């Protein structure tokens, strides 16, 4: 092979490597997931570190045995949760998009992570299938306001039943309407807002109060 021929081949090879690298990047995987099913992905841009820290702030990590995440996507929240999670705890990440689940399973090497292709409405069945009775905390970025009719209510009710007393449902949204889906099932709801995110997000911490045990 001549020197000129070798130089001619290097260009296409570099291009192929760049395309392959880009196709495997979290940003590209996230965009693919959004385009594939925008109704189930809240935003085309992953959450900011500021939002993540604020959302996870109230969690009592030393008490966590099981943390559940709805709609993990490419792991924008999954990795920070694992960084805070006790060594003997588990994180169950549930997503309806099998591409995201496959990506997480391959990209994150952590035995505490259990990535499940499924619906958040089936959270109780999923956690029981992995040997748990309740979750301590459940996190969601699912776009409740654009979910099919009835799905948001089903998820809100199922989530409240799956969380232990004293635990919480952590929700970050771009529409405050999510409160309508969770208020009927939680005893106390705190609300916050984060401007340093694209787009700015409303945050909710919906708590299961211990006094609710008598009512149950």
Stretches found by the model and what they are:
Residues 90-95:
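Conserved SAM-binding motif I beta-strand of class I
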Residues 101-132:
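S-adenosyl-L-methionine
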Residues 153-165:
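A short glycine-rich, Lys/Arg-flanked "PGG" loop and its adjoining helix->strand segment in the class I
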Residues 165-173:
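Conserved beta-strand signature within the Rossmann-like core of class I S-adenosyl-L-methionine
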Residues 74-86:
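Conserved SAM-binding loop of SAM-dependent methyltransferases across substrates and taxa
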Residues 23-25, 29-62:
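Class I SAM-dependent methyltransferase Rossmann-like catalytic core
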Residues 193-216:
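Core SAM-dependent methyltransferase catalytic element
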Residues 63-73:
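Conserved class I S-adenosyl-L-methionine
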């Amino acid at each position: 092979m001549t020197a000129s021929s070798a130089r001619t081949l290097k260009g296409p090879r570099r291009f192929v490597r760049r395309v392959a690298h880009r196709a495997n990047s979290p940003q590209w995987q996230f965009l693919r997931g959004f385009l594939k099913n925008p109704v189930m992905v809240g935003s085309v841009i992953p959450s900011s570190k500021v939002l993540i820290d604020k959302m996870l702030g109230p969690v009592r990590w030393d008490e966590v045995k099981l943390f559940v995440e709805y709609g993990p996507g490419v792991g924008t929240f999954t990795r920070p949760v694992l960084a805070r999670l006790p060594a003997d705890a588990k994180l169950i990440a549930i997503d309806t998009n099998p591409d995201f689940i496959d990506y997480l399973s391959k990209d994150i090497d952590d035995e505490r992570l259990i990535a499940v292709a499924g619906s958040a409405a089936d959270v109780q069945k999923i956690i029981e299938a992995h040997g748990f009775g309740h979750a301590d905390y459940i996190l969601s970025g699912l776009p409740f306001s654009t979910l099919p009719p009835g799905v948001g209510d089903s998820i809100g009710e199922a989530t409240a039943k799956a969380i232990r007393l004293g635990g919480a449902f952590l929700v970050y949204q771009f529409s405050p309407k999510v409160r309508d889906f969770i208020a009927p099932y939680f005893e106390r709801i705190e609300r916050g807002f984060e401007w340093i995110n694209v787009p700015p997000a409303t945050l909710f911490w919906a708590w299961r109060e211990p006094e609710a045990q008598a009512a149950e």
